[in-house]
Amino acid sequence: MGSEPADVSQMCRDLLSTAVSEMGGQERPGQVAMAKAVDQAMRDKLHLLVQAGTGTGKSLGYLAPALVYCVEKGAQVIVATATLALQAQLAYKDIPTILDASEKVLSRRPRVAVLKGRNNHICLHKAVSYTHLTLPTICSV
């Protein structure tokens, strides 16, 4: 494994600590260990598989090192989710929190975009094909 200056790991730790504090929570040892492992894997360009239980703080555990990496390297990071529920949690709760913490700790607020696949958008062709239906028919439960 490669080595990075201690201040980089400290920035990641400070960012995580600030974000967790802003959410009214406390760091968990597993969350800190995960953030450190993600940080190291990104720097060494390695794959990493993490398994952790519900409530471990996985989202902030990977977002903190990802943001430090983005700011430090000027790189982009892609976070893909398996569910729309997790995507919404990230987009509306975890990412805004980590970005607020980033302004305080890193003096930067990286740009973030939420991208969705075509299955999450209306198909204009299909929408037009349903125009013969009345609104109550389309909206009936």
Annotate each predicted stretch with a short phrase:
Residues 65, 135-136:
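Proline-centered helix-kink/hinge sites
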Residues 2-20, 74-133, 140:
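A substrate-engagement module of RecA-like helicase motors
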Residues 28-32, 54-60, 80, 88-92, ...:
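Conserved structured core elements
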Residues 60-73, 96:
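Walker A/P-loop NTP-binding motif
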Residues 37, 41, 66-69, 101:
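Generic, well-ordered alpha-helical scaffold segments in large soluble proteins
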Residues 44-62:
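Walker A/P-loop
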Residues 5-49:
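Conserved pre-motif I regulatory segment
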Residues 44-48, 73-78:
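Short, surface-exposed connector motifs at secondary-structure boundaries
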